[in-house]
Structures are given as C-alpha cells and as structure tokens.
C-alpha cells in the first residue's frame, strides 16, 4: 500500500478544522455548518481508522504502515507507523471525538465554532502522538496538543477554568521537559 494512510488519518481532522474555520458565524451561536462539518470529518476519520484497524496484520508485532519523510536535513525524520497497541489508542481517540462533538452541541453555549476547531485540532495532535516513531515528532505533537487543551479548559471549563488551564499547562509542560 503506497498511500500515506497514517498521514491522512492524522491530518484529516486538521483539514476539517480549516473548513470549520471558513464557515460563516451565525448570530444565534449555533453554527450548523460548523457542526455538520465537524461531525462529518470525525466520523469519516473514524471509519478510515476502522479500515486501518481491519487491515493491520495482527500476527505481526512490528510496526506497520510505515511512512518516512526527511524533514530537517536528515536529522529529523517525519516517521509514522502503528502497531497493535497504538492502533487501539488511535481507534479510541477517533471513537471519542464524535461523541464529544455530539455532547457539546447543546452544552457549549458560547463560541461553539471555536470549540469545534480546538477539538478537531486536538484530535490531529493526539493521533499524531500515537502514530509517531520519531522522538522529536512525538514531542512536537505532544506539546502542540497542550495548546487546544489549554484553550478548551480555559474558555469552556468550569468555575475556576483559567486557574485550572494554567495549572494543567504548567504541570504538563514541566513534566514533559524531562522527556
């Protein structure tokens, strides 16, 4: 299989987030175009990941669907691959995101479009973490995932959302520096 399927499942949510960004905001804050695009993107990505899970050879314990691209003068390689454990985490991520989108439609009262963008971008980074075979790329995806999580907690969180967002960001950032 020559098609870069792991890159596709990683960046499809990011493309969906771009389309959600391009939708026109409506005055009633229930941007149905953004909702439909988010649901469509996340469900399509889930079914593609189901296909990958079905296609993986479960008798092989080595990495499969390996993609490798030189990135920074051969020092850092953009290398993706999955094994039996990582595909389960990717599948779980792709299963949870549509549920989050459906549940947030009525519970998020302000800036629903921005929330959906943050959720799709977060899906991209989480899947990137589970597909990465290069330590630098893994670290970049992991750290980049802090940004949408910080926004989700800080804008749409509970009563002490700003305090919680900064604590989450600092503890996770400082903890990952040791990696």
Set out the residue ranges of the language-model regions.
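Transmembrane helix-loop-helix hairpins at membrane boundaries of multipass inner-membrane proteins
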Residues: 1-7, 19-102, 106-117
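Residue-level signal for helical boundary/lining positions with a hydrophobic bias
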Residues: 9, 79-80, 130, 139
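Residue-level recognition of transmembrane alpha-helices
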Residues: 9-13, 38-41, 93, 119, ...
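Hydrophobic, membrane-inserted alpha-helices
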Residues: 15-17, 97-98, 119-126
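Hydrophobic positions within alpha-helical membrane elements
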Residues: 18, 88-89, 139, 148
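Alpha-helical multi-pass transmembrane bundles of energy-transducing inner-membrane proteins
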Residues: 26-34, 125-179
């Amino acid at each position: 299989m020559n098609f870069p399927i792991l890159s596709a499942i990683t960046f499809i949510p990011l493309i969906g987030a771009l389309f959600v960004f391009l939708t026109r905001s409506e005055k009633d804050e229930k941007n149905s175009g953004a909702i439909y695009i988010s649901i469509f993107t996340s469900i399509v990505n889930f079914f593609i990941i189901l296909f990958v899970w079905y296609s993986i050879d479960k008798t092989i314990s080595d990495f499969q669907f390996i993609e490798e691209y030189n990135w920074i003068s051969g020092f850092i390689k953009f290398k993706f691959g999955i094994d039996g454990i990582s595909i389960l985490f990717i599948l779980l991520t792709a299963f949870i995101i549509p549920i989050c989108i459906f549940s947030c439609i009525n519970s998020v009262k302000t800036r629903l479009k921005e929330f959906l963008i943050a959720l799709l971008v977060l899906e991209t980074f989480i899947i990137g973490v589970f597909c990465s075979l290069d330590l630098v790329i893994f670290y970049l995806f992991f750290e980049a995932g802090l940004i949408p999580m910080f926004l989700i907690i800080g804008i749409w969180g509970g009563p002490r959302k700003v305090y919680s967002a900064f604590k989450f960001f600092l503890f996770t950032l400082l903890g990952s520096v040791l990696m």
